[in-house]
Swiss-Prot record:
Membrane topology recorded in Swiss-Prot or TrEMBL: Multi-pass membrane protein
GO biological process terms on file: endoplasmic reticulum to Golgi vesicle-mediated transport
Subcellular location: Membrane
Presence of the UniProt keyword Membrane in the record: yes
Sequence intervals crossing the membrane: 1-21, 39-59, 67-87, 94-114, 122-142
Pfam families listed in its UniProt record: Erv26
Origin species: Bos taurus (Bovine)
Keyword annotations from UniProtKB, A to Z: Membrane, Transmembrane, Transmembrane helix
GO CC term (a single one): Golgi membrane
Protein name in UniProt: Protein TEX261
Family: Belongs to the SVP26 family.
Presence of the UniProt keyword Transmembrane in the record: yes
GO terms for MF: COPII receptor activity
Length: 193
């Protein structure tokens, strides 16, 4: 009998971890570079998710409360999209969207525990109605930090931000996490003369 040990599992985990991390890093770079196109793509994803939810209600008779919460969540996502790529983590829309993601998951788990559907259909529901839009917003959290100043808010210029908010050189978000991981795993060598 062959036992599964940490020595067997660890190399597999280490081999499977870098490709998704590299893909997410590249995706974060693309989102930072093309914020207008990303906003448009997220808007189409929200419309697609809304159409899927309406179709599930009309053709599959999914519960009204589950579809209603999903549609309200998409409405909140449209509110987040109004200030994209500048997403404030303390804004009511962002906090409400995080809470609604949890509520949507609870309702979906409760529904699929009572009703049998094949795994592929359950996975499709979770992917297109619950995961894809929050994932898109999550990956694009760092996109607002590298956009040039605009006229979105009066008095929000570079000089007043520097003096009122302190250091603006700090970068936050998923891109910083991936940059740290990249430097920790594959440190760059500097030539010393």
């Amino acid at each position: 009998m062959v036992g599964v040990t940490l020595a067997n599992v660890l190399p597999v985990c280490l081999a499977l971890l870098p490709p998704p991390a590299a893909g997410l890093y590249y995706l974060a770079e693309l989102i930072e570079e093309y914020t207008v196109a990303t906003s448009r793509i997220i808007k189409y994803m929200i419309w697609f998710s809304t159409a899927v939810l309406i179709g599930l209600y009309v053709f599959e008779r999914f519960p009204t409360y589950m579809i209603g919460v999903g549609l309200f969540t998409n409405l909140v996502y449209f509110g987040l999209l109004q200030t994209f790529p500048f997403i404030m983590l303390t804004s009511p829309n962002f906090i409400l969207s995080c809470g609604l993601v949890v509520v949507n998951h609870y309702l979906a788990f409760q529904f699929f525990a009572e009703e049998y559907y094949p795994f592929s259909e359950v996975l499709a529901y979770f992917t297109f109605c619950l995961w894809i839009i929050p994932f898109a917003f999550f990956v694009s959290l760092s996109a607002g930090e590298n956009v040039l100043p605009s006229t979105m808010q009066p008095g929000d210029d570079v000089v007043s931000n520097y003096f009122t908010k302190g250091k603006r050189g700090k970068r936050l978000g998923i891109l910083v996490v991936f940059s740290f991981i990249k430097e920790a795993i594959l440190p760059s060598r500097q030539k010393i003369y």
